[in-house]
Amino acid sequence: AAEPHPVGTVEHALVQAYLVGRMAELGLEPTLQAGLLSPAAVERIERRGDRAEGLQAVNLIGVLPGRDPALPAGLMMAHYDSVPGSPGAADDASGVAAILEAVRAIRARGPAERTLVVLLTDAEELNLDGARAFFSEHPLRDRIGAVVNLEARGGGGRAMMFETGPGNAETIAEFARATRDASGGPSSDSLAVFVYRLMPNGTGFTIAAQRGLAGVNLAFIGRPAQYHSPSSTPDALDQGSLQHIGSLALETADHFLRAERLPEATANAVYGDLFGLTVVRYAPGVGWLLLAAAAGLTGFAAWGARHAAGLRWAEVGKGVASGVWLLSSGLVLAQAVRVLAGPVGRRVDSPETYYTLLRRLPWMEVGVGLAMLAAVLALLAGRARIGRMAIAGVLVVAGLLTGVLGGFDPVGLGALAAALGLTFWPRGEDEGRWGGWLGLIVLVLAGGAVAQGVAPEAAHLLIWPALAAALAAAATVLIGARLKAWAAWAPAVVATVLAGGWLLGYGHGVFLGVGMDVPGALGVIALLIVMLARPLAPEPSGARTLAVGAAACLMLACGLSLAGRAAEPAPPPAAIAVP
């Protein structure tokens, strides 16, 4: 990864020769497979001003024999080409290096039962042509039973398992067992897999999954400025990320190679890791049981608060309305702050613009996070205390800004209408601590029930925090529903620290993945954290301080988003790596 090495260049040929030598040193007896470039690949080559005539995708294939050649083999896969203009230390020299080191480690552990096939694909950046050639033409394709693919969309951060083959329940169970001892621990979530399936993106693993193969796709996406960038050098690459993805790949592949049987397609599992320590997984139907448990605990807490603290059902309804206001106003503010950093949606009309926005992503994340904090502080201060006209004015300006800079957005318009309506609702506040807390829990449980019915793999993001909040509320009733003793605050503090800390890390991953296009996704994270911490909010006497804090956060958010433009200006087109 010293120099860019796209298909057809001298540097590409040098990298190919070097890798063949390294594979031979590791006892893989490498062979080459040449395949035709697709029309889309040819078009990309010609678009950058080069000739495609005579070029092919040349895969490098190595085999580490197992003790039983009749068993289905394991496959480790990465691509060795880069885009023009980028050395590709992360994408995907890191994956190639990690695989070669994993081969060395697997050999050192002694012979495995299954054969390991190493596939370093070519022309991935052009149109996944190397993977297509292997899985459609190579004789080994029918021997593969499980796949571990390594990728990168950035130059750092924790490596995450973000894609599986179809029907992944058995795959997830094996991945969880395999990565218990991985350096850095497991990092994966069924929501990420669900969302990735809906995206137009693809990697070499996409071709394997289309054949129905079990397996996992690993990648890190932190330090997004390095993606397809001249800055993607070995010195700039996060060595911790390389270690993490390598350890996950090694332990998973080694587990597959020594397993009595490989995972098969069954149902999809619901799962997520807890702070990288373990993977919680269960069948989709279990989500309904968790919802029922959370609803029961919430009902118990409401009963206790009603009898001990005089809770009225109308206050719970106001708490629900406050949560809807937070979601809608947070989305409006997030979109406005986001468009200050650059175009969004269909207005991102070139690779140059896309990569420039990636470099600005850290600025966007902090800015959008501050915008969400502003909405939270305004919620806690009270719309009436701040001034309904003042809040409405801010929301309208934010909506107009989004429309002018970002274009027509029906979701944003709907959110603006909801936020304005609730801002002027005269009976939409004064829900009290218990009403506000339980109302937010009820809102999240309702959202969790909808998600459980439509997409159970995504519902746990709502169900788990709601269950934690419901447990805390029920425990608080048992300790002291009047919230007079210090001990009564303990359940909410514990839930906020543990579940809230998990959500903060989750939110960072969400923004790295989809924040450029859907910044309002952080509104869900904000709602969940407020749900956990709602009883800890200060008394109404501190409303002025909260209002000042909200204004300061929003102004700082706008300033940071604009600063991203100045700090990361759009470079000349020639300086951009175009895939």
Give the location of each predicted region.
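Soluble extramembrane regions of membrane proteins in the secretory/endomembrane system
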Residues: 1-282
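Solvent-exposed, well-ordered amphipathic alpha-helical segments
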Residues: 106-110, 170, 174, 178-181, ...
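C-terminal domain-closing interface element
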Residues: 142-163, 287-310
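Cytosolic-side membrane-insertion boundary helix
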Residues: 264-294, 312, 357-363
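Alpha-helical transmembrane segments of integral membrane proteins
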Residues: 294-579
